[in-house]
Amino acid sequence: SGKPTFIRF
């Protein structure tokens, strides 16, 4: 749920 989709979807 943020900008880094590879860390937090």
Swiss-Prot record:
Q: Which residues form a coiled coil?
A: none
Q: Which family does it belong to?
A: Belongs to the FARP (FMRFamide related peptide) family.
Q: Which organism is it from?
A: Ascaris suum
Q: What is this protein called?
A: FMRFamide-like neuropeptide AF5
- Cellular component GO terms, alphabetical: extracellular region
GO biological process annotations for this chain's record?
Answer: neuropeptide signaling pathway
Any keyword Signal?
Answer: no
Alphabetically list the UniProt keywords: Amidation, Neuropeptide, Secreted
**Where is the protein situated, by its record's location annotation?**
Secreted
Q: Which residues carry this modification: Phenylalanine amide?
A: 9
